[in-house]
Amino acid sequence: MKRSTLVEYEDASSEVQLLYDEIMDTMGSPKVLNFLKALGHNPHALRGVWTMLKETVIEGEIPALLKQLILFKVSIVAGNRYCTSLHGHAALNLDPTLTYDDLEALSGGTCTANLPPSFPVAIEIVSRAALEPKSVEDPDWDFEDQLRDEGFSDSEIDELLAVGFFSVMMNMMTDTYDVPWESPFPPE
């Protein structure tokens, strides 16, 4: 059952078209991603999600590759095909030395790709916090100290956790709207 229609540029209100223009300009893309077009019926919802995406995923101190790997891990573990596809493609584009097998191993916690040593630690911690939020209450798990030990500042820890929060929200949204993916992942 299709739960959402995508609002194409030519069918969008002038306010949504302005947001689409900003999105395409910021992302350097000639098109708007489907999950954003699914929100094209409501400029307030679109602007809210776009602002979160821009501030959390596109901008910031944390390397884009690490953010995409976190988003991929949360999405694949959660079983979200749209976000797995989107972030898998993004990660492979950011680091052409990575393979689909590397990403699959990463989702199982066994990645041997040539990543900075802090990346797998951050990916595991943030994905656990995102997928099992009550786990942060465990008195034996001091995830902040673990991240600091890997060289992350308090500001970077906040940003990492924000990526985790964003991933949960986007997985829920794209599943609820049944957003069609731009291209399958792994690539066919």
Label each residue range with its predicted role.
Residues 1-188:
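Hydrophobic alpha-helical segments
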